[in-house]
């Protein structure tokens, strides 16, 4: 009798043709897998996977800081300050290194380890600050500073390191910008009672300001394009200055005792320009009715 159990079912013997067929089939499957893997590698090469955290902070923390009036930086940081009704502080980190952020006697202090930047030296720490008013913003490291909003009192910005300073729209009683380092400024809209710029380092920038008074003093090296509307503009140069100033004001006073190239345009009711230094002054477009 023939066995009827499935486990004892007779198997067909493997002939030479069957073995050859299986070998060719295995080879075809292997080849297909290799080609698919190669295609996958090529796709990854052409479209690399985004790095972890691309476009998003790797670390975010909201700090419960209240009552502060200043910021002091000795690290590598991007500070975004908005004058508003409430206090709010958020730290965002995009690198593996962590900055140290503390509140010390009413001042937010920021310090970074030696490896606090990325391979290109860009800021990897962002500090977003909202407060009714800040009195001081001090930089002794590397800072990208953006300011906006409406605050009372005086905001003093002091730079002793490297700073990129931007203002989109800021209102205050008085703003003091004092530079003893290297600063690049882009002030597109500033509305204050008094605006003071004192440069003892290297300054390169553009600014648009509406104020009762504008005081610009250069004791270092500066290249500045400015548009001023208000009451009285005073310019003093004791260093090396290249200034282009467009005014719509009552009084314009300029004095040079250094090396300067000054261009004045617009309108001013009272004008006085003098000095004992080496200067090239262009007033052809001033009060040119």
Predicted segments with their positions:
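Intrinsically disordered, low-complexity terminal regions
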Residues: 1-289
């Amino acid at each position: 009798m023939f066995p009827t159990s499935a486990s004892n079912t007779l198997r067909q013997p493997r002939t030479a043709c069957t073995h050859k067929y299986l070998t060719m089939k295995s080879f075809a499957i292997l080849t297909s897998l290799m080609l698919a893997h190669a295609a996958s590698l090529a796709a990854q090469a052409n479209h690399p996977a985004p790095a972890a955290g691309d476009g998003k902070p790797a670390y975010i923390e909201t700090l419960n800081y209240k009552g502060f009036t200043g910021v002091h930086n000795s690290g590598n940081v991007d500070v975004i300050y908005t004058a508003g009704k409430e206090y709010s502080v958020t730290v965002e980190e995009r690198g593996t290194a962590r900055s140290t952020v503390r509140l010390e006697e009413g001042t937010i202090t920021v310090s970074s380890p030696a490896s606090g930047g990325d391979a290109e030296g860009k800021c990897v720490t962002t500090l977003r600050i909202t407060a009714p008013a800040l009195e001081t913003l001090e930089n002794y490291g590397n800072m990208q500073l953006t300011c906006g909003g409406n605050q009372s009192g005086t905001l003093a910005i002091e730079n002793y390191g490297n700073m990129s300073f931007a203002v989109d729209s800021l209102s205050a009683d008085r703003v003091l910008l004092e530079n003893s380092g290297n600063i690049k400024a882009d002030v597109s809209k500033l509305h204050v009672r008094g605006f003071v710029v004192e440069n003892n380092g290297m300054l390169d920038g553009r600014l648009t300001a509406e104020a009762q008074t504008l005081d610009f003093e250069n004791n270092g090296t500066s290249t500045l394009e400015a548009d001023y509307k208000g009451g009285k503009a005073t310019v003093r140069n004791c260093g090396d200055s290249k200034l282009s100033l467009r005014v719509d004001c009552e009084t314009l006073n300029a004095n040079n005792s250094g090396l300067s190239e000054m261009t004045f345009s617009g309108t001013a009711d009272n004008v006085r320009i003098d000095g004992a230094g080496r200067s090239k002054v262009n007033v052809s477009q001033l009060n040119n009715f």
